């Protein structure tokens, strides 16, 4: 019922995906007929509402029996530390019989249930294995290649089946869709006001080598790690200003987050707020999903901002500017328009209204007067 409520709320506000993640009770390796049928019915319920659904599996750091573990080249025993060859503690060798069974169970789950989202938290991190009895590799020298090839083949299988992949590692060329934007998990236990700035810093720093849609962020609707009431958004209707800041931080950057909690809204006012920002993102989705030009990094001392650019779209640029201060900001900034494809003239529309023409300088820039309300946000379209 909790998952169905999440599906219903996603459909109501325009969200598109539900992930049953760690702590939810989801058991992707449970291959009992009754459990698989329950998950199949849940997938049908989600599909009827236009929602993609799937779940989580821990691979690295999950622990392992000695016969299945990645064996240290230095000690001859299961590796438990980085010095012994393990990136995240005691982990299985996925080129073992255990690994074969693991991927067989995952494929069976998706084939049987029809679910189409997989979050592989702790993908294969590159641990070598010195075992000479594992069925999938000969020894230490081929162990990394064999393990990497096995998980890469699985991700390619997922991609071919239309399964969306959240993978916290750089497996994009193997079929993965998203990796973390670059946050530190314990930051989401800090007071809410800290999280607002840190979130924008993560987005700013995480989009030099990624497009916005390649990196996922995190919003702790309920407590995550720690921090208590000061760090969480629940009750949602009591923290609407903060909730809106998080939504505009993310949707204004074209970045999707994992909203961790059982619900997206708790009152009609909260529902309208979330719906408003989802609709905003979808209206400008093409340009908001486009590459980012970095204007000013967030530091909590002055304005910060980013600009999406896409020379192939009608909207050549989308500027998002934020004000962390208790007073309004009004100033001239230089906006570099080279990557918009514009060469002579640009039309700037504050919040998509009342276009004003600007002539580009020789370096393809314009000088733009921005206005941002206290603790607020503003945006500009360039055509």
Model-derived regions, located:
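Conserved structural scaffold segments of CAZyme catalytic domains across common CAZy folds
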Residues: 1-69, 100, 257-302, 310-317, ...
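The substrate-binding groove and active-site-proximal loops of carbohydrate-active enzymes
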Residues: 1, 21-36, 84-103, 135-147, ...
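Alpha-helix-loop-beta-strand connector modules within alpha/beta enzyme cores
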Residues: 39-51, 143-163
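Active-site-adjacent "subsite" loops/lids of carbohydrate-active enzymes
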Residues: 37-44, 48, 52-115, 124, ...
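Structural preference for beta-strand elements that scaffold enzyme active sites
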Residues: 17, 50-54, 116-117, 162-166
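C-terminal beta-strand-rich structural cap/linker in extracellular carbohydrate-active enzymes
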Residues: 359-383
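Active-site groove signature of glycoside hydrolases
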Residues: 16-23, 103-136
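Active-site-proximal substrate-binding groove within the catalytic cores of carbohydrate-active enzymes
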Residues: 151-355, 369-371
